[in-house]
């Protein structure tokens, strides 16, 4: 009987240890490069098709957060976390064209460079991952739920009139929810230290529709579709799991 109790106690201890190892919590921080995917905007006014395009580039930022991880077995793991990220994009130039709708002829085409241009955003992210372990190396795929908290725009358009060539303002975003797909990988050391790299492909259009007055004397206003933009974020981080 004594042997049975000893074996049972050892089994319970083994199960408890295994279960304890299935759940892990951790924290991480790191560097990121972010950009926004921008589509052209267009409008028709007085028989003219007016299009504009904003050209952007990646800008550096950083992120930090915490997470919980669960292992169904030695291979399959899932993770849910909370991350705060400083994202955005560099604003490089703006291009515009005016085309005659009746015959398709080009009336004017111009490009203006942007000096010291930046779009700075701060965002809460909830990344959800599914991972597969290969001797500590874990490829992962998932989704990212983002909540935009702050937006600031800085730019100076070269060659524009002095009264309207500079913008430096903080914006209150009307669209705050951002949904995206995540792809990445991490490498785990036995000590609990790990390194990871991820890419977030934003699918949500974060621009806003706005009404502009095209004929002030007649009081005519209509809604114009602005340029759409979606997040593109590369993150590289280091963290520790407990």
What are these regions (language model features)?
Residues 35-59, 86-122, 148-178, 204-235:
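Extracellular/periplasm-exposed beta-strand and loop segments of Gram-negative cell-envelope proteins
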Residues 27-31, 62-72, 82-84, 126-132, ...:
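Residues on the lipid-exposed face of transmembrane beta-strands in outer-membrane beta-barrel proteins
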Residues 60, 192, 200-204:
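Short Gly/Pro-enriched loop/turn and capping motifs at secondary-structure junctions
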Residues 20, 73-75, 134-137, 190:
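Outer-membrane beta-barrel channels and translocator barrels
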Residues 22-77:
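Start-of-domain marker
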């Amino acid at each position: 009987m004594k042997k049975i109790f000893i074996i049972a106690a050892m089994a319970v201890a083994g199960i408890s240890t295994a279960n304890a190892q299935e759940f892990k919590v951790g924290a991480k921080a790191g560097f990121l490069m972010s950009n926004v995917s921008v589509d052209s905007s267009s409008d028709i006014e007085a028989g003219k098709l007016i299009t504009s395009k904003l050209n952007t580039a990646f800008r550096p930022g950083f992120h930090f957060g915490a997470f919980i991880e669960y292992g169904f077995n030695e291979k399959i793991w899932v993770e849910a976390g909370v991350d705060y990220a400083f994202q955005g994009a560099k604003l490089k130039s703006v291009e515009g064209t005016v085309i005659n709708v009746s015959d398709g002829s080009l009336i004017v085409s111009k490009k203006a460079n942007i000096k010291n241009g930046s779009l700075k955003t701060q965002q809460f992210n909830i990344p959800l991952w599914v991972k597969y372990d290969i001797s500590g190396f874990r490829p992962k795929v998932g989704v990212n739920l983002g909540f935009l908290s702050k937006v600031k725009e800085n730019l100076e358009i070269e060659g524009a009139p002095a009264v309207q060539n500079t913008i430096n303002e903080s914006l209150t975003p009307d669209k705050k929810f951002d949904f995206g797909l995540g792809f990445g990988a991490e490498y785990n050391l036995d000590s609990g230290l790990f390194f990871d790299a991820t890419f977030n492909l934003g699918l949500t259009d974060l621009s806003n529709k706005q009404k502009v007055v095209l004929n002030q004397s007649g009081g005519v206003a209509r809604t114009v579709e602005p340029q759409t933009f979606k997040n593109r974020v590369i993150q590289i981080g280091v963290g520790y799991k407990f």
